[in-house]
Structures are given as structure tokens and as C-alpha cells.
Amino acid sequence: MEPDVGGSNPPSCTKLMNKKIFKPRSEWPAGFVDRQEEELLARDLLISNIKKVMAKYGFQYLETPSFEFTDSIGKFLPDKDRPSEGVFSFEDDKKWLSLRYDLTAPLARYAAKNFNNLPRPFKRYQLGTVWRNEKPGPGRFREFLQFDADYIGTSNLFADAELCCLISEILSTCGLTKKEFIIKISNRKLTKGLLEKLKINDENKQSIVLRAIDKLDRVGLEGVQYLLGKGRKDKSGDFTKGAELDESQIKDIINFLSIKDLSDNNFEKIEKIAGDNQTILDGVNELILIKKYFSLLKFDNFKFDPTVVRGLEYYTGPIFEANLTFGVTNNKGEEIEFGSIGGGGRYDDLVRRFNNQDCPSTGISVGLDRLIYAILQKNKIKVEKESPILICVFDEKYMDYYVKILNLLRTKDISAEIYSGTANIKSQLKYADKRGCNYVILCGDDEVSNNSVTIKNLEIGKQMSNSLKDRDDWKESSGSQKTVAFDQLLNEIK
């Protein structure tokens, strides 16, 4: 529509002047974050180490879409009647789509779709971004990079044991010692059998109980008791509805959670709790077998912990969780225990949902951004960052000479750039300092006419500036810069 420039009622200038100009916010949404180069380089190094470990263990690389049909994963959402609860979803052409909240549900869909063509067991690993519509916290984001490794199509518990060894090896490549992480193991059949024995048959109530147990490290024993009962209000005032169990049921669950290792005495305690419940007894026998495989694999950095239940509902057997045992500093400057960076377990029924085919499977996941957050705080990973050489611009008329230097450096795979802008040399040197440049190249009338370059070592310059007493000392000292012939440039900066 064309503006009316000749009408008798022009728009009011006062109204136009008073109209507020919209300014979008420069903040990110809660649970999302910009990631800087240091973190991204650490991520690249970690991914490189992961790929080496996965090749050694014989896993194949796979990638699945970021979006899935919500009904493919909806059964496992916190509330399947509210597609946006727990995940980010939208309706497209009368069908609900959701951003994947993990990499396991998409893998199950992939395995069902390609069931007849895949070797079984199918050993795959994947690296990809996932999204959770949940309350964020320190090192816990709504968008994060996740790593998964899975066995599809095997009931052999050696696969479960090997996954624990695999994660342990990956954490070791991050510079973590055995004292700085632990693999906790349990079995979903123990809690499933306990729910059967206590006659907690309502599926929704079962889910609340499992999520309550899973939160023990975060909310404490008293918090779990509230979540098993009427419910719990957190520090922000948000209320989480509880399972509304009776006091006897709550007491039995708390007693079960007090068992802390896989000693013969504790196996007997669990069997006593089980009575004639075969589900619990099966879970105990599976843990005994996994413990045997750990011994064969010479893996001892694990412990039994019945509070490990894993929040997702598709687990059916052995489950495991990788925990960091050291503390980190949160945004308030407080020292907190970091806790879980990943976990997994056996999910024998997940593929069957799609094709009604028996396909026992097991897998493990690690939140890489959460792991990187921790290891960077502890300086556990050293990232080699190549700083560029800055070619300063004295005069635009010498641009051909500057480009000649640039081409020489880049043909030798040396990071270099010509300053882009109109700032003076002092400002260009400040720019180089902010970029972390170790060298700058200075070329004015003398250098161009003599086919030479002046190389300034900023690192040496910083050291000298701390020891020089006055301006005269600085002028007399030439240790931080050197003029050489053009063909000697590469020799000087190597």
C-alpha cells in the first residue's frame, strides 16, 4: 500500500514523535546460553576423544532428526496429555512435532524403521543437541549437546557392563582420576518389584515415586519423603505434587534406599525385602552377573546405589549413572557438588512399541556441555588455541604489501589477518591484545621501501613492561620487536 502524500489529513507529527521505537532484548531465554570459543574448543577436543574411544569399542556413527512426531515419544513425557510439558512442541498440519529430549527415543524409531536391515546387535553412537522444557540450574541447561552409545538387539548383560567401562574411559580422557568420578549402578526391577510388593499399581503414582527417588541427591531424604507423601515446595515457591503414599509404604521405600553396596550381606537384605517377589529376585541376579563381568573387565570404579532409578520411564532392567565427585562453584560463588553428568540402562520394550518385535537394548548418555562446564572449572582439559598474527595497517596505499605478507603466512597454515578498520596504530595494538595475538607485523614507509617487516612480540613486550622503569628504558630496549628481511619472516615467527 502506497503512503498518502497528497491528502488533506497528513499523519500527526506529534504522534509519530511520541511513538516508542521497539528495542528487542539482548538477553537469552532462561536455560539457554551463548558458548564462547574456549568452551567450543574444549567440546571439539572432547568429541575427538569420544570418537577414538568409540572406534576402539566397535560402534557405528549415526545421526537422527532434531524433530520427531510427538506420539513417537509422548508415552514417556511427564504428562502425555500436555505435549509441551517437558519438551518443546508445536502443531504442524494437525500433527504434533517435538524437539527431541534425548537421543534414545529417536534411535528406537530408527531401529524399528530399519529393523530388517540392521545387524543385531547394532552398536551405534550419536552426538547431537537435545532440548528439555524443564527448570534450569547451574550447569543444567534447556539446550545441550548429548552423547549416546547403545546396543540394539541383545539381552546379554556383558553389553551393559561394557557401557560402564566405556564411559569410564571417556571420562579418563578428560583428565579425570578414578577418585573424581564414580559409576553408580542399580536395577529398575528392584524398584518395580518393590512397587508391586507395596501394591502401588497406579502408573501415574509409580512415575511420581520413581522421580522422587531419583531426586534424593538434590532434595535430600526429607525432600523425598515429602514427594512420596503430599508433595514438596522448593525454595522458589514452586510446588511439586507428591505420590500421596501412606506412612507404611513411605517407610518401606526409605528402608530400601538405605542399602548402599553389593556385598553378600546386602544381597541377602534385598532378598529378604523381596520375599517371594520374583521381579526383585531377577534384578538381584542380574546385578550379580554384571558385577562378575566388571571383574573380568578389571573395572572397579563403581558402586551400587538403589536411589539410581533414572527419570525416564522406558528403562526395564540394569541402570547406571556417571557422577562427578568433586565440587564446582555456582553463579553465586557457592561450592556445590556437581553430581550426575549422564547415565542410562536397559530398555527392552522401547523398539517393540513401533513394530511389535522383540528387541532387547541398552544404552548410556552423557550431557557433554554439562561435563565441559565441570572440567573447565577444574582445568582438567588443556585447549591449544592458535592466536592469529595481526598485520597492522599504517597506510591503505601499502595494502598490496600487507596482502603479500598475509598470503605468505596463510600458505604455510599460519593464522593471520589484516586489521580491518580505520583506527590508529595504538588502537590496532589494543585490538591485538584483546584477540590474544602473540605477534603483530608493522610495515610503514621504511619497511616497504626496504622489502622488510617489523615483527613485534606482544608476549615479550608484556614481560618487559613489567621490568622497565621509565620511558627512556623502553625506548632503548628493542627486545620486543625486530625488523627482518621479508624472506626471513617465517623463520622469525616459528
Regions found by a protein language model. Name each.
Residues 34, 188-189, 193-200, 251:
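Phosphate-rich ligand and nucleic-acid binding surfaces
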Residues 42-57, 68-69, 104-116, 123-177, ...:
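Positively charged, Gly/Ser-enriched RNA/tRNA-binding surfaces
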Residues 78-80, 197-201, 456-457:
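Short secondary-structure boundary/capping segments
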Residues 3, 16:
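Cationic, low-complexity basic patches in intrinsically disordered or flexible, solvent-exposed regions
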Residues 17-105, 161-165, 169, 176, ...:
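TRNA-binding/sensing appendages of the translation machinery
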Residues 6-7:
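Short, positively charged low-complexity motifs
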Residues 82-94, 199-230, 324-328:
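Acidic, His- and aromatic-enriched active-site or binding-groove loops in soluble protein domains
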